[in-house]
């Protein structure tokens, strides 16, 4: 693939010819996996997704021009899946399985369009909501976040000249490559790109993916970005997300339905997928509550993705649970993905080496680490913690508790109710940077 002169591309400001979202495949693979299940099992559920800026000190509406934001959101709504993309989805092998997407689902997907959005400014922030059928609003999460993060990067670099931009990208590349050299020292490492939603830009994410592909070879197992997977002949990777148990819990009519919501999600998932896609995401309402109430069959799944507890602490908790169920952790898989960088990856890898199979999903600190790279300090180049979460389902508020109270989302009264119901044990307060 031809190399792009990133500094020159930024300096030319040719944004009308260079939209942020180029394709509906410019999303995380698990959104398509989840979408097929939602389409098949929950086609009549409405769900609202909302932008949440957890770095509240950053006033997004003061940094990003509203007209530019609307133009990019409007452009994303014009996109449709191309013939080439549909053929690739239908014919490619994912996780060792052919035709993972049903023909009826692909026929429906052919005419898919992102739904309308609701945008307004309030107190220096943007309120951005997506209302409508869950089958449609779920697909806004990744492009909305990518658009806002890239617009913020563009605004921060707007006044830099060509030499300053050259220096910026040269330093960022050197910084990234120094991480590659450290990762090479970890034998049998398995790591993938999870950095789409908070990336500096699409072109920078592509550079990082190509750098990892060359730099660490087979240790780089693929990318969550479907478009990049298709374009670079990499594996498209991803399992499932918190929105599934959040929606089912919001729809629960009884305490039993609320308690069983996380496990019903897994049963639904197992109807569609198997093997290495049988990865449990346990922390939507706290990992302690999940493990305490989990049916025995959950221990038969391939692995867990501890997403909000400190990685070593969270991994140890799951290993002990596997042992209590008579399972050998060496035959199981832990996928670490929360705010990872090289130090955390090295520490976690060495702690668990030989005790459990490991994979690492490297996100924001892969695709948006420009700290200290600009010739002068630019706050707008520092990554922020921005999420787009489901906030209601069929008019009922949706809640995420997380293992880190700083990551909890939802109406405060509902969060308090869920805490009373699921418990508050073993949740660890940590500063959320990304």
From Swiss-Prot:
One of its GO terms (molecular function) is nicotinate phosphoribosyltransferase activity. The keyword Methyltransferase does not apply. It catalyses: nicotinate + 5-phospho-alpha-D-ribose 1-diphosphate + ATP + H2O = nicotinate beta-D-ribonucleotide + ADP + phosphate + diphosphate. Its EC number is 6.3.4.21. It comes from the Bacteria. Signal peptide: none annotated. It is an enzyme of class 6 (ligase). Transmembrane segments: none annotated. Keywords: Ligase, Phosphoprotein, Pyridine nucleotide biosynthesis. The modification Phosphohistidine is found at residue 242. Belongs to the NAPRTase family. Catalyzes the synthesis of beta-nicotinate D-ribonucleotide from nicotinate and 5-phospho-D-ribose 1-phosphate at the expense of ATP. PANTHER family: NICOTINATE PHOSPHORIBOSYLTRANSFERASE (PTHR11098:SF1). This is Nicotinate phosphoribosyltransferase.
